[in-house]
């Protein structure tokens, strides 16, 4: 988007949902458990941006040349200057989850988690309502858009954990598919169910660690367990 903004002279604001600006306090979001000190924390962002820019270069080089633009060198950091102005950065993260790093510049802002305040227009499946009303509050287990090489094996592990706990569960398979053992204390969601409607009715929330799901669980005030697959999810698990 920087290249498009540069070509057309359009001001741009950068938004982020997990840390992408180097600082002393936390390493890059994909490696939050490496506690190697301030030097590593800052260097991890340089390495991350170097890899991102290397991948971007494959398709941006031709596009920029076709549009009469120079190809910038790989420099291992974000582009803060564009069209003679400093690009503002807005983080959609609560300072209760990530205190603002002292080393961030004045152009970096933290707005808190973003939430659509449009009144929900949602009618739950009567079977879901009946399940929720039939006993104690269940635990939510969800996978979002995550998939693994063998979701049947993953769901076998989940089924074993559900049986061992004896808890009631609302399960959202997400995009993963896979087969789940037929358990009487489990309701499998079908179709779209808003987290902001569902989570307040849960006992706890167990999920993959997407930024949006994490925010929804925290807004609902529920105990949250993140079992990450990759990307920024280890960061949320570490918080």
Language-model features and meaning:
Residues 30-33, 187-189, 225:
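Short, hinge-like loop/turn segments at secondary-structure boundaries
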Residues 190-238:
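A donor-sugar binding/catalytic signature common to diverse glycosyltransferases
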Residues 166, 173-195, 201:
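Nucleotide-activated donor-binding/catalytic signature segment of Leloir-type glycosyltransferases, i.e.
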Residues 1-138, 145-156, 160-167, 181:
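Nucleotide-sugar-dependent glycosyltransferase catalytic domains
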Residues 10-11, 185, 223-224:
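Glycine-enriched alpha-helix->loop->beta-strand junction motifs that scaffold or abut catalytic
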Residues 140, 144, 159, 170, ...:
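Generic hydrophobic alpha-helical scaffold/packing signal
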Residues 15, 92-93, 111, 142, ...:
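Generic beta-strand/beta-sheet core signal
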Residues 95-97, 115-116, 144-148, 176-177, ...:
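Short, glycine-/Ser/Thr-/acidic-enriched flexible segments
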């Amino acid at each position: 988007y920087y290249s498009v903004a540069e070509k057309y002279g359009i001001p741009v604001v950068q938004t982020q949902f997990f840390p992408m600006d180097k600082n002393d306090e936390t390493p890059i979001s994909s490696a939050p458990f490496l506690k190697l000190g301030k030097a590593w924390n800052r260097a991890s962002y340089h390495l991350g941006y170097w890899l991102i820019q290397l991948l971007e270069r494959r398709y941006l080089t031709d596009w920029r040349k076709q549009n009469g633009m120079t190809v910038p060198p790989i420099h291992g950091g974000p582009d803060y200057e564009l069209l003679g102005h400093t690009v503002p950065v807005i983080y959609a993260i609560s300072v209760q989850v990530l205190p603002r790093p002292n080393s961030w510049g004045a152009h970096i802002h933290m707005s808190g988690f973003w939430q659509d305040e449009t009144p929900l227009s949602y009618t739950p499946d009567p079977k879901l309502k009946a399940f929720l009303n039939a006993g104690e509050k269940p635990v939510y287990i969800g996978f979002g858009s995550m998939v693994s090489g063998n979701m049947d094996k993953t769901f076998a592990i989940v089924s074993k954990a559900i049986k061992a706990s004896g808890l009631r569960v609302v399960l959202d398979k997400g995009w993963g598919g896979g087969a789940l053992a037929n358990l009487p204390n489990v309701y499998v969601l079908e179709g779209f169910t808003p987290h902001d409607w569902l989570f307040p009715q849960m006992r706890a929330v167990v999920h993959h660690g997407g930024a949006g799901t994490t925010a929804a669980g925290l807004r609902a005030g529920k105990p949250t367990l993140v079992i990450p697959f990759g990307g920024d999810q280890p960061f949320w698990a570490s918080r």
